[in-house]
């Protein structure tokens, strides 16, 4: 009976693991998330850089 809780916990851990895709990706297949992450980071940096100069006099500041 001592093994039952351990067995239940192992079953829960196995069930919560992400599924594996059965089809392997070809060598030239690049996930789009890598491109979107760089675009989002550049957009955020540009926005912050543009807000640095105009928020001093509050004329074009979008933050409060």
UniProtKB/Swiss-Prot annotation:
Disulfide bonds: none
GO molecular function: toxin activity
One Pfam family in the UniProt entry: Chi-conotoxin
Keyword tags: Amidation, Disulfide bond, Secreted, Signal, Toxin
Record carries keyword Mitochondrion: no
GO cellular component: extracellular region
Signal peptide: 1-22
Modification type Isoleucine amide: residues: 63
Main location: secreted
Propeptide feature ranges: 23-52
PTM description: Contains 2 disulfide bonds that can be either 'C1-C3, C2-C4' or 'C1-C4, C2-C3', since these disulfide connectivities have been observed for conotoxins with cysteine framework V (for examples, see AC P0DQQ7 and AC P81755).
Compartments, as annotated in UniProt: Secreted
Superkingdom: Eukaryota
Tissues of expression: Expressed by the venom duct.
Family: Belongs to the conotoxin T superfamily.
Domain free text: The cysteine framework is V (CC-CC).
Protein name listed in UniProt: Conotoxin Pu5.2
Provenance organism: Conus pulicarius
């Amino acid at each position: 009976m001592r093994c039952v809780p351990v067995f239940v916990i192992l079953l829960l851990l196995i069930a919560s693991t992400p599924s594996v895709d059965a089809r392997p990706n070809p060598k030239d297949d690049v996930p789009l998330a890598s491109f979107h992450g760089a675009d989002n980071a550049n957009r955020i940096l540009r926005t912050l850089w543009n807000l640095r100069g105009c928020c001093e006099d509050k004329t074009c500041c979008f933050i409060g």
